[in-house]
């Protein structure tokens, strides 16, 4: 019987690059403008609705598609693809070296709620596009959008990555909700990234917390010793 290799599922935005890049802020502003334009509502109402959909569905676009019949691909072009990532994201050689070292022992997989175009852009500008065995993303062309923290999304990433044993899955994400969802789904190793200066979550959502993605390998050494 073949023993499955452990796999690390990495979130992308605000996880493999720091929040100080403020990409989330730029994205939020574009989403709000898109809401306001497409739905014909004031900016304040658009901001409120964006937050409601994000909290409830994991991604704002799912709420737009479900309740307003918005074209998700048009949303992607107007929001994600309009971000000037090339001016903001810098190549991260330390991260690259860590990932290449990890791949000697683990499968490494991107697991993001972004669309594939945005994900590929981020990986390219970070200089790590060749450091992963695959990528699972939110398919904006799908009839029914699924995203973290929906259980179906965790099922999908395991299926696409070819892993069946939940105890072989190691997941790192900055989102409390996504980490909690993964733990409730049954993944044993769920690691929330909480940057230095941000308060630690109470109660803790996952099995572990790290402050710096570049120190992730040190945590893996601890996990392997458990």
UniProtKB/Swiss-Prot annotation:
InterPro entries: HAD-like_sf, HAD-SF_hydro_IA, HAD_sf, Pyr-5-nucltdase, SSM1_domain. It comes from the Eukaryota. GO terms for cellular component: cytosol; nucleus. GO terms for molecular function: 5'-nucleotidase activity; nucleotidase activity. One of its GO terms (biological process) is pyrimidine nucleobase metabolic process. Belongs to the SSM1 family. This is Uncharacterized protein C24B11.05. It comes from Schizosaccharomyces pombe (strain 972 / ATCC 24843).
